[in-house]
């Protein structure tokens, strides 16, 4: 792994010159983080992407793969959505002017092991284990199509096929589910020991039923032939979170039996 800065053009050229395909996943990824830090979001997401595109052009990269979001369809998502929309336009211009091939991946709701602090499922699992309580803004009727991070990773490689060149691809789950059903599932897996509380939401940056209001280039959705079942994936995430926060934070208080390891592939 090389630790660096995506606005360091010299370092970018050194790294990118050794490759034929570039995956760009760097930048500010949390909606709240982007809302709180618009300047950093513009610098990392928009300017950073421009630096990477320029380096790809200079080094004759065969394909530029960009991690976008389903929020590009929306008028929600604050500066996060704005930055992703801007990046997609930049990519289109580099394709039109410099013939830089691309694939734009619009990710839906991801979950799985090693989730960061703003991942919804990862966050509520941590709440449940530490506090025996989940506080959710909204009424739980919000709809999401969750996809396990391993399934998303497989799809992100499959798009290297030639038919996905210069394409917009949606990577999301094969089934939709209400948020309240996710929370109830987590509660059941933890022996019904969790209190679930719904509070009025002051955050207007997240969608409830659908993100579709703004209309960018339409994307094809990859339908996964094989994928991780949602319940098993959430259970695996519970084990992973429990292991990471330590044995003193959940097992004794919640009176649940956790195996030492879980075989989840």
Where are these regions (language model features)?
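Active-site segment of SDR-like NAD(P)-dependent oxidoreductases
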Residues: 29-32, 70-77, 108-111
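NAD(P)-dependent short-chain dehydrogenase/reductase
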Residues: 79-81, 85, 89-144, 149-158, ...
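Conserved cofactor-binding/catalytic machinery of classical short-chain dehydrogenase/reductase
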Residues: 8, 21, 48-51, 63, ...
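Active-site beta-alpha turn of Rossmann-fold NAD(P)-dependent dehydrogenases/reductases
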Residues: 26, 65-69, 106-108, 172
